[in-house]
């Protein structure tokens, strides 16, 4: 089901909703502003104990998330190259980051409302992550607006959400492939992006990226922690399972260099880092 356009209100405060119902409402909300407000209310009510852990509906039919009509989604190869030599190039880079953060909001919400047979702490972690991704999206969107642009002004691709669809059937696979692969890759590349903005004197964007990098370590760590939890529950060796899934879903492809310090803080072992670097070497 594909959802576009402007969504309706997020919730009825007169009812005690389940966390699944509320997270799903936020997930399907198409308006960026509406989604941000919805997540803020979701986190507030979760912390206040106003949400139940009932699961009133299956999620098998939900294969897409709410998003606005723009940006137009294109193949990754058709996304314009982002060079920082012009204001438009700077905006294009910021737009790409904003799109990642918008997708990350949806990914966290999807984890909250899709995977029911997990401890309350799992849902609390991903509600927190969704809230932090909302904050990141707002920071990057403001930088876009400072340059005279907004989210939706450039084309974008849907690769991150496509991986979410492929991993929807199993939280173990989702934790391995989204936080521990896609988001972990963000830990690797963000320092270089920061240097590029620093080289053109854009300290405001550098400061935004510092916040994102700091918080994303925590997001990847949450993915690592729940991946290990699920492996333990199933009697699986976590490292061999991780690399088996990488081979299955990404043909073992890996890009380097790695931000090893950040990955260690996010729950990667020295053995895993050595294995990842070996994949880079081919």
PLM segments and residue spans:
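N-terminal amphipathic/basic-hydrophobic helices that include classical n-h-c signal peptides
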Residues: 1-14
């Amino acid at each position: 089901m594909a959802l576009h356009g402007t969504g309706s209100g997020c919730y009825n405060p007169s009812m005690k909703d389940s966390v699944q119902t509320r997270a799903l409402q936020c997930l399907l909300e198409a308006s960026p502003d509406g989604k941000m407000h919805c997540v803020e209310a979701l986190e507030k009510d979760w912390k206040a104990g106003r949400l139940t852990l009932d699961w009133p509906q299956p999620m098998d039919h939900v294969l897409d998330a709410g998003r606005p009509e723009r940006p137009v989604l294109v193949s990754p190869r058709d996304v314009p190259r982002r060079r920082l030599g012009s204001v438009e190039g700077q905006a294009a880079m910021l737009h790409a980051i904003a799109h990642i953060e918008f997708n990350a909001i949806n990914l966290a919400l999807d984890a909250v409302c899709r995977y029911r047979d997990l401890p309350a702490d799992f849902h609390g972690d991903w509600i927190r992550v969704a809230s932090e991704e909302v904050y990141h999206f707002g920071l990057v969107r403001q930088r876009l607006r400072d340059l005279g642009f907004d989210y939706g002004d450039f084309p974008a691709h849907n690769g991150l959400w496509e991986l979410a669809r492929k991993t929807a059937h199993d939280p173990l696979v989702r934790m391995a492939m989204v936080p521990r692969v896609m988001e972990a890759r963000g830990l690797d590349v963000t320092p270089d992006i920061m240097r590029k903005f620093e080289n053109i004197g854009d300290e405001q964007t550098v400061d935004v990226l510092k916040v994102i990098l700091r918080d994303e370590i925590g997001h990847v760590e949450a993915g690592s922690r729940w991946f290990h939890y699920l492996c333990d529950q199933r009697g699986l060796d976590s490292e061999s399972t991780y690399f088996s899934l990488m081979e299955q879903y990404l043909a073992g492809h890996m890009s380097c260099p790695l931000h090893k310090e950040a990955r260690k803080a996010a729950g990667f072992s020295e053995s895993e880092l050595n294995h990842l670097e070996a994949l880079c070497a081919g």
